Regions:
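Conserved blade-ending motifs and adjacent loop-strand segments that build the rim/top face
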Residues: 344-357
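Acidic, Gly/Ser/Thr-rich repeat motifs that build Ca2+-stabilized beta-propeller blades
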Residues: 32-186, 234-250, 301-339, 345
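Conserved small/polar residues in nucleotide/adenosyl-binding loops
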Residues: 358-364
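Beta-propeller blade signature
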Residues: 134-142, 194-204
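Blade/loop signatures of beta-propeller domains
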Residues: 32-45, 209-215, 277-288
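Mobile, glycine-enriched helix-loop/loop "lid" segments at the mouths of ligand-binding/catalytic clefts
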Residues: 200, 259-288
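Bacterial N-terminal signal peptides that target proteins for export
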Residues: 2-17
Length: 367
């Protein structure tokens, strides 16, 4: 985890190892001085700075050698090593469009990365009808991506610069989940002929799994796994069930925590616990409707959630099974205690520090 001491809330920040590198010997990035100790409800954390100088970092992944791959929304793929941020960026990326909230967004390593060296990237890209989310993969060879190929293009594209979604998560079967926002055009999230406002599931090679819920339905895009999602920017697999849990941004209020299941409609914009910006007026039909899922948990006022992971390590047994996510709005680390499919407690940590949390990864041992 990283504290950003200067510049804007989202500039030059990066989440790093294990809830703030609580022990120096548990990680390979041990060249940085301890910055401060922070008390929480269940223990004291040590915060370290891992890297500075990043430009809107958005996604990250740990390489087998302990280095960290980091995406910068402005279009660069960087490496953080034992001496901090490496000067040169990785070359060979696909063509990326930086506009509004769009740019180079998330990344994930192939489950067989040790053998095939595939890195998957989500990003905004231009098309004949506008811009939209795409996913490509390339083989990492030293400081370059080789054999880059586009595996998925969100269709149709749009003209705005909002709500690209873009989290990437592999499940145990090697299928890739891609979260997509509604692109600022609310009705699109309820359409099966439109990728916007949905969660996508494809194979690692970009094919449609045979058991996807809308495969074979006339007019539906077979890649769609769920619909009615406003803008999912945090997703993680439950360590016991293997199901995909996610959170998404609401409008003014109504950020949600959900379990993403096949064929489920999560309601946006027909139902929501949020209201319209500025006017505070109701959106859609209220908060409930038959055939549309209720969130497991929601936030009013919004916290602007970002990044998400379940803690599964041994170093902090009191947190095992808890969800951690960042709050962009309040500049906090949020911890959720889970009982089955219920949130039973919430703790806000690292309050009022000059940093926003754009991504969160917890790791208690070196890769």
């Amino acid at each position: 985890m990283t504290k950003i001491p200067t510049l804007s809330q989202r500039l030059c920040s990066i989440w790093g190892y294990a809830i703030v590198l609580a022990t120096m010997q548990s990680v390979s990035l041990n060249a940085f001085a301890v910055d401060e100790m922070v008390r929480t409800e269940k223990g004291t954390l040590r915060i370290q700075i891992l890297a500075e100088g990043l430009d809107y970092p958005w996604g990250m992944a740990f390489l087998p050698d302990g280095r960290i791959l980091v995406t910068e929304r402005t279009g660069s793929l960087r490496i953080v090593g034992s001496d901090g941020l490496e000067k040169k960026a990785i070359r060979g990326l696909p063509e990326i469009t930086v506009r509004g909230q769009g740019g180079l967004l998330d990344l994930a390593l192939d489950p067989d990365f040790v053998n095939n060296r595939y890195v998957y990237l989500s990003y905004a890209a231009k098309g004949k009808d506008g811009i939209g989310t795409e996913v490509a993969r390339g083989r990492l060879d030293d400081m370059r991506l080789e054999d880059v190929e586009v595996l998925f293009r969100a269709t149709p594209k749009g003209s705005g610069g909002r709500h690209f979604g873009s989290r990437l998560v592999f499940d145990p079967a090697g299928r890739l989940y891609i979260t997509l926002g509604d692109r600022g055009d609310r009705p699109r999230a309820q359409r099966l002929d439109d990728h916007a406002g949905s969660v996508i599931r494809i194979t690692a090679d970009g094919e449609v799994p045979k058991d996807n819920p809308f495969t074979g339905r006339p007019g539906a895009r077979a890649e769609i796994f769920s619909i009615g999602n406003r803008n999912v920017q945090g997703a993680s697999l439950h360590p016991d069930t293997g199901e995909l849990w996610s959170h998404e941004h609401g409008p003014q209020g109504g950020d949600e925590l959900n379990i993403i299941r096949a064929g489920v409609n999560y309601g946006w914009p027909v139902i929501t616990y949020g209201v319209n910006y500025m006017t505070g007026t109701r959106i859609g039909e209220g908060t409930h409707k038959k055939g549309m899922a209720q969130p497991l948990h929601y936030w009013v006022p919004s916290i602007a959630p970002s990044g998400m992971t379940f803690y599964t390590g041994d170093q902090f047994p009191q947190w095992r099974g808890n969800i951690f996510l960042g709050s962009l709005k309040f500049r906090q680390l949020v911890r959720l205690e889970i009982d089955g499919e219920r949130v039973v407690h919430e703790e806000r940590m690292l309050e009022d520090r000059p940093v926003s949390y754009t991504h969160l990864t917890l790791q208690t041992t070196s890769p």
